[in-house]
Amino acid sequence: MYKIRLRPLAAAIILSGCSSATFAQLGQNLSVDIRSLSMGNAVTADPPGISAIHFNPAALTKIEGLQTDVQGILANFDIKREFSVPAGYNVFGYSDDPMVCNDGPEVSSDLCTDFKGTVNGDVEYVSLYVPILKKMVDLGEGIPMAAPTAGIAYKPPGSKMTFATAMYAPLVAGFGAENGNAGNYMGQQVALERITYLSPSIAYEVNDALSIGASVGMSYQAIGLKTDLRFPNELIGMLRMIDEVVCTPFKENQDIITDILLLGMCNTEEGMNPFGRFGQMQLALEQSLSPSYNLGVLWEPTEDFSFGMVYQSSAKMRLKGKYHIDNAKAPQELIKGLMSSPTGQILAAILGFPSVVPASESGLVSMDFEYPAHFQAGVKYKVLPDLQVNFDVGWTDYKAW
């Protein structure tokens, strides 16, 4: 069993599976509070009860006595994904990519003569990483994700201080698809979760108009990924050209001279293809305790107007877990061919290639990961006795990803 640190390429694959910051934003604050979610989370200046622990802990001063809160949220990730290629699409002169090309085996051209146009790779079901099982679980097509939340708060009679804690999920998102889905190279199964299981909080009423508050979140962070791998780049395209053009006359006539001159790359049973499946990678990483904090201010000069601000800190982590990679035959054959030639062995050493590519490999893995900081400010204004307007502006430091 090997132990490695996750390289930037693998990290990029994980985050590309999350479809950039847009997908992350979709999962942010999805399962914290129903009322806040229905208002687009524009509640920084409008106290959402115990859930103010997350949105603005200063608003906890609005609670009187003992209060509990239990909620259940259902979410369905019915996400549409479309893929297309630009005009002139090719990799080292090849464009017969079966993902976007209709050409069958009867067409011998290396250039696609009939592109498919837009290719759909829709999400088919919700996937979640289950901590106890330490693996991802598919909920099945059409079954929504269920996210329960619970909290308790207490403000002693006559006191200016409020104490609270809650359990909620500030970030939870996951999706999956069956084999053959066009989106599987961006993640066949992806799960990104942050569950806050304890959040001791305190709020203080400075005066009738001003309150301040703080909370400390103790969270569980997990990332799960299963993705097909392929690398449609110029190097792989060149290797295909060598296999199909240069090596063809020597496939059945190998000798030591051709092995030395051609680096052993013709001694393969299957050549590299930029559009072929390179393998499949599975990852499961987690951290049981990831602390962060929230700081909030609430100013209510009148009953009709209020202003609130909240800062939610980042959380830097070293996620640890396991990986498993199933390698396709082509990369195994490439390394096997290079190792059959003395010049191929020299080239492999220069390029840092391994001496062998096993059919599968697994081991321990670690990854530096940062949950991004977030700042939000908002106002609440009662236009009429029965009409209220909430307006919030937020910023999330997704560049940390």
Language model region names:
Residues P57-A59, Q67, G72-N76, F83, ...:
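Short glycine-rich, polar/acidic loop-and-turn segments at beta strand-coil junctions
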Residues N29-V43, T61-R81:
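Transmembrane beta-strand segments of Gram-negative outer membrane beta-barrel proteins
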Residues A52-N56:
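A beta-strand signature from Gram-negative outer-membrane beta-barrel systems
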Residues V130-K134:
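Short Pro/Gly-enriched beta-strand edge/turn motifs at strand-loop
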